[in-house]
């Protein structure tokens, strides 16, 4: 009986340790500073209507959102943006000459706050842009940027370039209450911030405009910025192999292993590292990083391996 109690106690303690580890791994996101910005156009989508509506999955209970009503072919700015916790900042936003400002008419009294945020939009293309400046210190180097876009048509590809990083929304339907990556929102992780500024541009000058309904900025936790394999595929008999390269931010420990558990010694200096691998079969590599604050992040890349047929050499392919 005493042995059974001891075993149960050990299982209980292991459960506590596992739970604690998972909790500590997520503390970076819990402490993140966020700024939410919504566009208001038309007569129905108003700040008062937002406050009276039920919370949604994007605009959650108790969160503070900043609103701006852009004017077509003009510069419209808002200053003193607040975080979702209601803390005032020096951040500001400027819609610079959007060519089109519209309300989709999807918001009504029985809809939640997500519908209001997706109701109104400003369209940008060419030199028209959105500039968010004087970001808080937590976003001084990098920032996660979420852009929510839903125009008044159901067949538009909308490009977004944010400080050199690019994502596309393929808008194929009106907002129906669910957010889907690539369909009505895009997420750009670890966007490099330039002198406290984030600049968003849309489609090219000869194309239709990219819609901006809402933008959310999130201060990032320490983690992996990028992890790539070049080339992603190697052939049997190739001596060059593939180069794995990575970039991390504020991480004190970085390790590399294959998905089946083989450890690969690596060195990371100033947040960057690289190593050449030459697997003899398709192999997935796992990069693990521990941030200075204890947060953990993981990224994977796969190097595909192609077997040659008889009488072939790599030069024949």
Kindly give the residue locations of the regions a language model identified.
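Solvent-exposed segments in extracellular or luminal domains encompassing
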Residues: 271-284
């Amino acid at each position: 009986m005493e042995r059974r109690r001891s075993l149960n106690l050990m299982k209980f303690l292991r459960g506590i340790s596992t739970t604690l580890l998972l909790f500590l791994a997520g503390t970076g996101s819990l402490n993140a500073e966020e700024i939410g910005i919504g566009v208001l156009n038309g007569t129905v989508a108003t700040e008062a209507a937002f406050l009276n509506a039920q919370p949604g999955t994007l605009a959650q209970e108790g969160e503070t959102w900043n609103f701006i009503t852009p004017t077509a072919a003009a510069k419209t700015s808002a200053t003193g943006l607040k975080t979702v916790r209601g803390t005032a900042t020096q951040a500001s936003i400027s819609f610079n000459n959007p060519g089109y400002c519209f309300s989709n008419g999807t918001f009504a009294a029985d809809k939640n706050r997500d519908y209001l945020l997706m109701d109104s939009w400003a369209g940008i293309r060419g030199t028209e842009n959105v500039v968010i400046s004087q970001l808080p210190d937590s976003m001084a180097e990098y920032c996660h940027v979420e852009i929510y876009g839903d125009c008044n048509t159901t067949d538009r590809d909308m490009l977004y370039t944010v400080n050199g990083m690019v994502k596309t929304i393929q808008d194929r339907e009106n907002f129906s209450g669910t957010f889907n990556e690539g369909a009505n929102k895009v997420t750009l992780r670890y966007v490099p911030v330039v002198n406290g500024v984030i600049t968003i541009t849309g489609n090219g000058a000869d194309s239709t405009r990219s819609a901006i309904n809402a933008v959310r900025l999130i201060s990032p936790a320490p983690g992996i910025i990028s992890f790539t394999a070049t080339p992603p595929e190697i052939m049997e008999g190739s001596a060059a192999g593939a180069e794995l390269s990575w970039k991390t931010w504020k991480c004190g420990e970085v390790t590399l292993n294959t998905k089946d558990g083989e450890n690969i010694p690596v060195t990371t200096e100033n947040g960057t590292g690289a190593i050449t691998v030459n697997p003899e079969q398709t192999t997935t590599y796992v990069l693990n990083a521990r941030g200075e604050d204890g947060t953990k992040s993981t990224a994977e890349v796969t190097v595909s391996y192609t077997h040659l047929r008889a009488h072939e050499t790599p030069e024949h392919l």
